[in-house]
């Protein structure tokens, strides 16, 4: 637990399920005011809010499509209305669509980039403007992926968007470090989330994934939530411009683990 987080306000985009819901719940457990954003899964976001409130925290569910700048502005305004300010902004919302690159439509490509990269920039931009206007320190956490550095066939748009998130994070961190604004990213590996539920229900598919992970098992959303809480806290006050890989070692070239390769 991080005492310095208590009473602060955090916005978490894409909080209906998976990593976003886990981070929102962890922030609530830290005593924070949580704005749980969703695009279409209202019930999921309200379940996140209920869990936070039942644990004694304060939270609000707010609809917004982060690929649209005006919706990001409205999300910020809702956070201001609900809790009077924003201290931490977490850009978690993201999508992925599998298709061979030679058959991937420009519209499909653009949709992924709009949500995963442009939406992240829009959130960063709005949060930074608020921090500067109030002359206050602030924290931004962007959700990247191991595919920030690992190529992913059939997901060229997703991999490109996450590589972009990594460099955007570094650039903004450098640009605003002297203003007390910290910008970091978290890059999850294989996680037990709803988006992976069907795949991991197949024992062979799960085992194949686990062979790519030096630690030998798939991670939990709570692993990412723990990383987010630390990055948001004063314990990470000297950390900015980094991507924290929460991946069980997946990015460590696992084929070389036992002298192979």
UniProtKB/Swiss-Prot annotation:
Taxon lineage: Bacteria, Bacillati, Actinomycetota, Coriobacteriia, Eggerthellales
Native species: Eggerthella lenta (strain ATCC 25559 / DSM 2243 / CCUG 17323 / JCM 9979 / KCTC 3265 / NCTC 11813 / VPI 0255 / 1899 B)
Catalytic class of the enzyme: oxidoreductase
Stated role: Involved in the modification of secondary bile acids into iso-bile acids (3beta-bile acids) via epimerization of the 3-OH group through a 3-oxo-intermediate. Catalyzes the reduction of 12-alpha-hydroxy-3-oxo-5-beta-cholan-24-oate (3-oxo-DCA) and 3-oxo-5-beta-cholan-24-oate (3-oxo-LCA) to yield isodeoxycholate (isoDCA) and isolithocholate (isoLCA), respectively.
Alphabetic keyword roster: Lipid metabolism, NAD, Oxidoreductase, Steroid metabolism
Catalyzed reactions: 3-oxo-5beta-cholan-24-oate + NADH + H(+) = isolithocholate + NAD(+); 12alpha-hydroxy-3-oxo-5beta-cholan-24-oate + NADH + H(+) = isodeoxycholate + NAD(+); 7alpha,12alpha-dihydroxy-3-oxo-5beta-cholan-24-oate + NADH + H(+) = isocholate + NAD(+); 3-oxochenodeoxycholate + NADH + H(+) = isochenodeoxycholate + NAD(+)
GO molecular function: oxidoreductase activity
Keyword Isomerase: no
Coiled-coil regions listed in the entry: none
BP terms from Gene Ontology: steroid metabolic process
Lipid metabolism in keyword set: yes
Enzyme Commission number(s) of this protein: 1.1.1.-, 1.1.1.391
Protein name: 3beta-hydroxysteroid dehydrogenase 1
UniProt: NAD(+) binding residues: 65-66, 92, 158, 162
Similarity comment: family membership: Belongs to the short-chain dehydrogenases/reductases (SDR) family.
Enzyme active site: 158
